[in-house]
Regions:
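Short, flexible turn/loop "capping" segments at secondary-structure junctions
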Residues: 9, 256, 322-326
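Nucleotide 5′-phosphate-binding alpha/beta core
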Residues: 1-91, 96-114, 118-122, 203, ...
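Helix N-cap/coil-helix junction residues
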Residues: 38, 48, 125, 199, ...
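AMP-binding/adenylate-forming catalytic core of the ANL superfamily
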Residues: 180, 289-404, 423
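Conserved beta-strand termini and adjacent loop/short-helix elements that scaffold enzyme active sites
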Residues: 160, 234, 267, 363, ...
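Short, solvent-exposed loop/turn segments at the edges of secondary structure
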Residues: 203, 258-261, 326
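Active-site phosphate/ATP/adenylate-binding loop shared across adenylate-forming ligases
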Residues: 1-8, 65-232, 240, 244-250, ...
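Conserved AMP-binding/adenylate-forming
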Residues: 215-310
Length: 434
């Protein structure tokens, strides 16, 4: 029998869910209008008042919010509660090197844990499980999100954080982990490392919870077949609540969105009209109960489709498909958002023999993302001794690692060797077959 953490909500009829969403939308719109000058101004520009929003069907009258709006109002411009009521902030890298900050009230943190716990329940986990978390802990939402979820579930969490694969394997084996959570690329690397060490039969694993970067069904099947487990796709974004916005169940027929807290729309990116079920468009979220930084119609730039039919598991929550891409050129590398503009800014800041002509190449090696940046440098550089070339390469790699938050391989090339484009420059070659 499929375990459902909150059947009242997760199996609610569409009419009941719409009534709950309507009640929450009316409340959140009034709150942002009264407390967030940014939203008040945006709504006034559209000639919309809180009284015009009577139900969830009126959501199309409201303005969009974008990542740029978050950046322009950094750090606390979109706060809807007094700063003293903020329990914590989480963050993610932005295009300008400034973080995208997401403040949380204590209730927001509790809701976050509850949503992740619903997902862990979809993965068949209970308070008897031991969940090994190898997502990074810190401003990045991965580690803490899974930790809060394990706590809400009553399970034991092992807060390993990222890196040191041998130690990860030792802890998983010695502590008897029954589930592990990390990016899919690291999950595959870890699975193969466990296999090579002959430890598959020593493990008690039954589930993997993986997200923070796009991955294919082929990759899922590979991890599952090596470790003899079920792997689940978890989705979230720091601005909305980190992991736990949506997750798939054992039927793996789309990710269930916790639509009582996060109202999903899938819209045609050009016309902003709603897409029919099954039609691909941009995913847009409205947070229905967030206290600290509610977001209205936040454009995620993730491309997906939506399905409102009831799942075989009995849940009526809408399901979104695996992501087919993004509407912009951002790349997710080892769970970190990397923008070509960040590379450009970093190279320009160095000046000297370095030209702002570059190419980012993303590969998968041993199932881990590897970012190589080709950088054009002055011809004179190549007449220098090898030691000087290595020093320059290391210097650029250091600057890029600081700017991007991921380590980078740097390849120095001669001027004009990177192809120029007439139109929009091709800055990224992604060989990962995602």
């Amino acid at each position: 029998v499929e375990r459902i953490r909150d059947p009242k909500i997760e199996c609610m009829s569409r009419d009941e869910m719409a009534a709950l969403q309507s009640e929450r939308l009316v409340d959140v719109v009034k709150r942002v209008y009264d407390n967030v000058p940014f939203y008040r101004k945006k709504m006034q520009q559209r000639g919309v008042e809180p009284g015009d929003i009577k139900s969830i069907d009126d959501i199309g009258k409201l303005p969009f919010t974008t990542k740029e709006d978050l950046r322009d109002n950094y750090p606390f411009g979109l706060l809807a509660i007094p700063k003293k009521d903020v329990a914590r902030v989480q963050g993610t890298s932005g295009t300008t090197g400034k973080l995208t900050i997401a403040p949380y009230s204590q209730k927001d943190v509790d809701v976050w844990g509850e949503c992740v716990a619903r997902g862990l329940t979809m993965a068949g986990l209970t308070d008897e499980d031991i969940i090994h978390v190898c997502y990074g802990y810190g401003l990045f939402t991965g580690g803490l999100g899974l930790d809060y979820g394990a706590k809400a579930l009553g399970a034991m969490a092992i807060p390993m954080s990222a890196g040191n694969t041998k130690r990860q394997m030792m802890c998983m084996e010695d502590l008897g982990a029954t589930a592990f959570a990390c990016t899919p690329s690291y999950a595959l690397y870890l699975a193969e490392s466990i296999q090579e060490a002959g430890l598959v039969d020593h493990m008690k694993l039954k589930a993997g919870i993986h997200g923070a970067e796009p991955w294919t069904e082929e990759m899922r099947k590979k991890i599952e077949s090596i470790l003899h487990i079920n792997c689940f796709d978890i989705y979230g974004l720091c601005e909305i609540t980190g992991p736990g916005v949506a997750q798939d169940c054992i039927h793996k027929a789309g990710l269930h969105v916790h639509a009582d807290y996060f109202y999903p729309e899938v819209l045609n990116p050009a016309t902003h009209e709603a897409c029919a079920d099954g039609e691909t468009g941009e995913l847009v979220f409205t947070t229905l109960a967030k206290e600290a930084m509610p977001l209205i119609r936040y454009r995620t730039k993730d491309l997906t489709s939506i399905d409102h039919s009831t799942c075989e598991c009995g849940r009526t929550l809408p399901r979104i498909s695996k992501f087919t891409g993004r509407t912009d050129d951002m790349k997710v590398i080892r769970g970190v958002n990397v923008f070509p503009t960040q590379v450009e800014t970093a190279l320009l800041s160095m000046g000297g023999v370095i030209a702002p002509h570059y190419m980012m190449i993303v590969d998968r090696e041993d199932n881990l993302d590897v970012l190589t940046v080709m950088v054009e440098v002055d011809e004179s550089v190549f007449s220098d001794e090898i030691r000087k070339l290595d020093a320059l390469r290391n210097k650029i790699a250091g600057v890029l690692k600081t700017a991007l938050g991921v380590s980078v391989r740097v390849k120095l090339v001669e001027p004009k060797s990177i192809q120029r484009s007439e139109g929009k420059a091709v800055r990224v070659i992604d060989n990962r077959n995602l």
